[in-house]
């Protein structure tokens, strides 16, 4: 698999289109950090790490719905393995005029665009959520 984070985002998108309550994905630290931001911003209910027999583990993500419709309307990967996108603090994108969130990987950790602006750090724009 060339893009593990893109794979997780696609699994979330597909599960919500099918109306699933949970979705699982192989565990990694970056995926867990992105899920922490999604949970803090209110886009997912939560997640838990379960151990598998191969030792890698698995993240089971609880998806969130409002009146039967998915809370996440749009989930797009910005920085891809073939084309990384880095931005300074002043250049961080505003998603849907501030209604959405960009998830940024910074030297201070993975955080939302608002947190990165307040911490005055830039970094790699991983994805946008609306």
Curated annotation (Swiss-Prot):
Reply yes or no: does the keyword rRNA-binding apply. Answer: yes
Task: Give the protein's function.
Answer: One of the primary rRNA binding proteins, it binds directly to 16S rRNA central domain where it helps coordinate assembly of the platform of the 30S subunit.
PROSITE patterns referenced in this protein's UniProt entry, alphabetically: RIBOSOMAL_S8
The alphabetical list of record keywords is:
Ribonucleoprotein, Ribosomal protein, RNA-binding, rRNA-binding
GO CC list: ribonucleoprotein complex; ribosome
Tell me which domain of life the UniProt entry assigns to the organism this sequence originates from: Bacteria
Q: Which GO terms describe its molecular function?
A: rRNA binding; structural constituent of ribosome
Q: What is this protein called?
A: Small ribosomal subunit protein uS8
Entry-linked NCBIfam families: PRK00136.1
Family assignment? Belongs to the universal ribosomal protein uS8 family.
Q: Which Pfam families match?
A: Ribosomal_S8
Cross-referenced SUPFAM superfamilies: Ribosomal protein S8 (SSF56047)
Q: Check the record and name the InterPro entries matching this protein.
A: Ribosomal_uS8, Ribosomal_uS8_CS, Ribosomal_uS8_sf
Oligomeric state and interaction partners are given as:
Part of the 30S ribosomal subunit. Contacts proteins S5 and S12.
- Extract one GO BP annotation from the record: translation
